[in-house]
Amino acid sequence: MSCVSKKQLMLDMTKKELRQQIKQLKSMTPLAVRQVEADMVFNTIKTMPVWLQAQHILCYWSLPDELPTHESVNNWLAEGKSIYLPRVKGDDLEIVPYHGAESLDDNNKFHIGEPVGDAVDSSCLELIIVPAVALDQNRNRLGRGKGFYDRLLSSTSCPTIGVACEFQLVDEVPVEPHDHPLDCVVTSDAIITDEEKRYLFMAQ
């Protein structure tokens, strides 16, 4: 086995171990607690300059083990924001307008509620809110390992915010050369920003 493949194997093992640790912590955290944390996270985001300026926002329709978004997404839609959700197409994510929970379809490979309708170009987005298995102090993100968000984020330059419960914020997430940190990380107890883009996320 080459040095490169050995290094990759060790990295994959470390990512797998971290995902397993977070999974155990999630199983010990009631949904009601995660909902309280979600309310705190999204209330924080709604005070940020980037949120106040953005009209077209990509979020995610949360799975049972993710920071809950259903209530917030519906509230934002009612408040007049243009909300978009991801839809899996092959190895990539399409960006589709969200018109309400009744328009979602979970008849797909991952049984995720996905919006129906025509996809739009990601260039219309002004803010992306990203789920994570784990986030770290350097704004690195660990996902589920499929690479969907990695590919999406590499194709857009709009501001990105990673959100998670407090226990999902760790000292260090294993990264690879092609990984790029998010612009901002928000938990119920922390805001971590790129200093050069701090003006987008911190009220002056």
Over which residues does each language-model region extend?
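Conserved phosphate- and dinucleotide-binding cores of soluble alpha/beta proteins
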Residues: 91-204
